[in-house]
């Protein structure tokens, strides 16, 4: 299956080499550019095949042919949560070795086209197959879905959600879409907005008002399952300095009661447990989050038996079309039950 990308160089673009444009502006990898060079009419400028060393100018029309059929698995590395994931579930839907899903969950599809699949992950399900969840991950469900449709697709989740977190997960259906959606330099980078219920009372914010938490994180040296803020660690240790990662969270309070508050969050970075650690550091941990708060009252609030976090909305430019996609996952049952206790009309948010 061939994919074509077309770009019209605007008047504000300064003269630059074709290869530099394809890397910086088109978000293509060195490997993808190299593969395109050797295809007939793989890279053209104004309809004429050209070299990547040529200079492009304002007004030029660039077309790149990117081929998926016959290529090997992308072997992409996932940096979404600040950890290089070697177990990215990049198995093929028609491959005999791809484990069959053994879960009672059904796949809730929010959006699908020839390049992208977006689904609503339930809380309690892992995104990628792991040793303990080799056949009951979200990726297993997606592989089974493609297999039933007789679609030969490599399963490539773009980022991941923690097991306890519900909400939107985007899957790329081809190698090029995956690299464009995952690249931090690409205009197609996915922007997520989360919904969380936290302990305690936070002042409700006016529209457009956001609060920023700029707290670097690293793995807790005493518990590898947890993350900690740099403020909790010795910054004078050279052994730790290289392990500390920048982490920036923005939050906005939608509703507040005497015991809990409903907030929405956006991330500049995507570190492991970033929202959970940052909110715990403010004294307002997520309801149900026993890993970062041991108070029994927190875990027993309403019906939350998990960290109250939901990947609510995503927005991104389509990797092959001049179209902005805005997707939203409905509130899961535990969030709806909690919101109903507030007596406010928050279900319409």
Set out the residue ranges of the language-model regions.
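RNA pseudouridine synthases
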Residues: 1-349
């Amino acid at each position: 299956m061939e994919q074509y990308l077309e770009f019209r160089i605007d008047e504000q673009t300064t003269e630059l080499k074709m290869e530099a444009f394809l890397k910086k502006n088109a978000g293509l990898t060195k490997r993808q550019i190299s593969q395109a060079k050797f295809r007939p009419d793989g890279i053209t400028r104004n309809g004429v095949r050209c070299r990547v060393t040529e200079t492009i100018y304002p007004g030029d029309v660039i077309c790149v042919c990117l081929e998926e059929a016959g290529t090997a698995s992308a072997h992409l590395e996932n940096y979404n949560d600040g950890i290089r994931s070697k177990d990215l579930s990049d198995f093929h839907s028609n491959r005999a070795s791809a484990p069959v899903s053994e879960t009672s969950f059904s796949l809730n599809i929010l959006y699908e086209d020839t390049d992208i699949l977006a689904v609503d992950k339930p809380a309690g399900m892992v995104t990628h197959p792991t040793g303990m969840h080799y056949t009951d991950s979200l990726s297993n469900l997606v592989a089974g879905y493609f297999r039933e449709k007789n679609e030969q697709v490599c399963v490539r989740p773009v980022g991941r959600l923690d097991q306890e977190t519900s909400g939107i997960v985007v899957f790329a259906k081809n190698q090029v879409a995956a690299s464009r959606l995952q690249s931090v330099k690409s205009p197609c980078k996915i922007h997520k907005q989360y919904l969380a219920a936290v302990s305690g009372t936070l002042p409700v914010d006016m529209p457009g008002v956001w609060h920023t938490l700029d707290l670097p994180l690293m793995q807790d040296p005493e518990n590898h399952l947890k993350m900690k803020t740099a403020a909790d660690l010795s910054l004078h240790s050279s052994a730790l300095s290289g392990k500390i990662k920048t982490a920036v969270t923005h939050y906005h309070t939608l509703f507040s009661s005497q015991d809990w508050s409903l907030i929405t969050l956006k991330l500049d970075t995507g570190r492991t447990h970033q929202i959970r650690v940052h909110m715990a550091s403010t004294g307002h941990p997520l309801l149900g989050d026993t890993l970062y708060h041991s108070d029994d009252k927190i875990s027993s609030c309403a019906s939350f038996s998990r960290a109250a976090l939901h990947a609510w909305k995503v927005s991104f430019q389509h990797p092959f079309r001049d179209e902005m996609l805005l997707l939203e996952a409905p509130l899961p049952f535990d969030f709806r039950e909690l919101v109903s206790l507030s007596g406010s009309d928050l279900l319409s948010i």
